Regions:
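Alpha/beta enzyme core
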Residues: 27-30, 48-61, 106-122, 129-130, ...
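Gly/Ser/Thr-rich loops at beta-strand to alpha-helix junctions
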Residues: 22, 164-166
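Conserved, mostly hydrophobic/aromatic
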Residues: 16, 161, 207
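Hydrophobic beta-strand scaffold residues
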Residues: 90, 158-160
Length: 223
């Protein structure tokens, strides 16, 4: 039953992503470590301003049924209710910010936080290179399978953002050129990553993947 309900049949989705946390506080505000209440409010105010830009877009004609926001609980906890009241789609992150390995932001309590805000999509950002650290990949797959099963048992949608960062040897093989890595190696590595993730029992409803430069490379990505 859960498998049959996989996917998203609502047509196009245009989602404004502002769920950045660690990078947002350091690069935008120069705040290191855990922000104090005053700093947290400053960051939260910036998130509200970003959200208000989306409300303005809807007022000017953007279709709310195809438009959404991806916002975090830490700094954007006031946004979900406002977004829902406007008929916007809501996506919220599950992963811990700023980690190379996927961890739950709220540990074993992840389900409570999802149910509290009731997003249309629960999103993960995962760095997975099929030729990377095998033990880390296995640990990530275990956590992702836990999340995938939890979501689909409750008929909740799973949004999977996949990044495939270059391993040192892969980058060396293309002369240290990141553009060549993206064009020549990443499409096949993305295919391998998605295959490994799905073979591990992790089923996403929506895949958000990095673009590929050549049309023939698109056929390598099994989606």
């Amino acid at each position: 039953e859960g498998f049959m309900s996989l996917g998203y049949s609502g047509g196009k989705l245009f989602i404004l992503a502002f769920d950045h946390r660690g990078s947002f506080q350091t690069k935008m505000f120069g705040i290191e470590g855990s922000p104090d209440p005053s700093q947290t409010e400053t960051i939260a105010d910036a998130k509200r301003l970003i959200y208000e830009g989306m409300e303005l877009a809807v007022e000017r004609g953007a279709n709310p049924a195809a438009t959404g926001v991806l916002v975090d609980e830490q700094f954007g906890s006031k946004v979900p209710e406002r977004a829902k009241s406007k008929g916007l789609k809501l996506a919220m992150p599950v992963e811990k910010s700023g980690e190379n390995e996927f961890f739950f932001e709220y540990g074993d309590d992840f389900g409570h936080h999802i149910e509290k805000f009731d997003p249309d999509f629960s999103k993960v950002l995962v760095r997975y290179n099929p030729e990377g650290d095998a033990a880390m990949n296995e640990r990530q797959l275990g956590r992702l399978r836990t999340l995938s099963e939890w979501l689909h048992e409750r008929n909740r949608k799973f949004l999977f953002e996949l990044l495939v960062p270059a391993e040192p040897g892969q980058l060396e093989a293309v002369g240290g050129d990141s553009d060549r890595y993206d064009a020549e190696l990443r499409p096949e590595l993305m295919r391998g990553a998605i295959e490994a993730i799905q073979n591990a029992g992790v089923e996403a409803d929506i895949w958000k993947i990095e673009g590929v430069d050549r049309k023939e490379a698109q056929s390598q990505v099994p989606l």
